[in-house]
């Protein structure tokens, strides 16, 4: 199966892809999946999971989920009135060069750290100007806490949004990235805005420019600062404000 997948992806990029270079940046959806504290969460029911009277095996079920939970995409409409809904995000923006900015050292010292414009320009000084069409991911190191809600969010109390503490991105840094022409911005925490945010200014900046967000991104530490290619495959929900995404990286 991995070989077949590699060949299919390779066909899209004009060459065969070594399956060992494909990194899945997606957490599975299950009872442990982390959502915003006031969300319903993921529900999965096995309607039938057995051998039929006719002798053949049959498995089917149903699931329900909030749009924003687990590894997911924020469509621009999420915080931008009149902006793109989930199904309207152009396919051309669902693949692109990955840029990984590591702020894990600062986040380890301050749970509420927010990536700054200086973090972005320091990255560019070392690795080069962020190209138009890039998808920028911020590595905070928060994946080490998944799926332990209290450590990951700062609170594990259902409905409690007043005591959240995790790293995010300053709106000024988001503005700088928008000026670079990026198509998506993601992070390995529950939100591109930090935990204590009440106005979600970073979401507003990105949404107003039709830049999508990626949240709860898994295993960012497996990617190099530059050189990888991202494939972003969200569930195609009409008029969706967001939804589950299968996020893959092709290593250089």
Predicted regions and their residues:
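Active-/binding-site microenvironments in catalytic and ligand-binding cores
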Residues: 13-252
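Sec-dependent N-terminal signal peptides
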Residues: 3-11
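C-terminal end-of-chain detector
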Residues: 2-3, 252
């Amino acid at each position: 199966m991995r070989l077949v997948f590699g060949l299919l992806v390779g066909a899209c990029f004009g060459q065969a892809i070594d399956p060992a270079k494909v990194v899945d940046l997606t957490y599975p959806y299950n009872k442990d999946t982390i959502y915003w504290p006031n969300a319903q969460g993921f529900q999965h029911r096995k309607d039938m999971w057995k051998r039929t009277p006719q002798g053949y095996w049959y498995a089917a079920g149903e699931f329900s989920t909030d749009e924003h939970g687990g590894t997911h995409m924020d469509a621009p409409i999420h915080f931008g009135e009149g902006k793109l809904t989930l199904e309207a995000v152009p396919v051309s923006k669902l693949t692109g060069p990955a840029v990984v900015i590591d702020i894990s050292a600062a986040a380890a010292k301050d749970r509420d750290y927010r990536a700054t414009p200086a973090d972005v320009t320091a990255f560019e000084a070392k690795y080069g100007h962020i190209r138009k069409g890039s998808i920028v991911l911020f590595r905070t190191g928060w994946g080490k806490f998944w799926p332990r809600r209290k450590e990951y969010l700062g609170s594990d109390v259902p409905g409690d949004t007043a005591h959240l503490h995790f790293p995010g991105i300053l709106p000024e840094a988001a503005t700088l990235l928008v000026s670079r022409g990026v198509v998506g911005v993601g992070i390995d925490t529950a939100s591109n805005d930090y935990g204590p945010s009440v106005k979600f200014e970073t979401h507003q900046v990105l949404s107003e420019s039709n830049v999508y967000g990626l949240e709860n991104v898994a295993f960012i530490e497996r990617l190099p600062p530059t050189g990888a290619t991202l494939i972003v495959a969200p569930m195609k929900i009409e008029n969706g404000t967001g939804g589950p995404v299968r996020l893959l990286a092709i290593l250089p």
